[in-house]
Amino acid sequence: DDHSFYDQYNSIDKLNNVVLVYKDGLVVACGAVKEYSPGVMEVKRMYTRPEFRGQKIASKVLQELEKWSLELGYHTCILETGRRQEEAVGLYQHTGYTIIPNYGQYQDVAYSLCFEKKLIL
């Protein structure tokens, strides 16, 4: 099962840097970053409720996560998404992420696609 594989790497107890977007008291989008290695943050748990997609909310969440990473002294963000997640792939490419070889636990996962972005001050 795809979910059980990913769930082991997405425990919320390891996510201390989280961005939440509220509309009328409801969380409509989220994202997080956690240290992957010195100087490198990994973007995790990007999600926008379906009825709020297409409003550039995810782009704003990603911008905040990148800004936060820079403020914390990191120079690069990496992330993984599913190859079939066309909206996510488009978001990451549109916001300056480039495809990289699958890293870490995703190295041999055919349905994973990994990205990287060098952050600019």
Per-segment meaning from a language model:
Residues D1-K44, R49-P50, L62-E64, N102-Q105, ...:
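Acetyl-CoA-dependent GNAT
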Residues G39, Q55, E71-H75:
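Short coil/turn segments at alpha/beta junctions that flank glycine-rich nucleotide-binding fingerprints
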Residues T48, G54-K67, H94:
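Conserved acetyl-CoA-binding loop-helix of GNAT-fold acetyltransferases
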Residues V61, Q85-A88:
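Conserved short alpha-helix immediately C-terminal to the canonical SAM/SAH-binding motif I
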Residues L62, S69-T81:
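Conserved GNAT acetyl-CoA-binding A-motif
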Residues I78-T81, V89, Q93-C114:
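Conserved catalytic-core motifs of GNAT/GCN5-like acyltransferases
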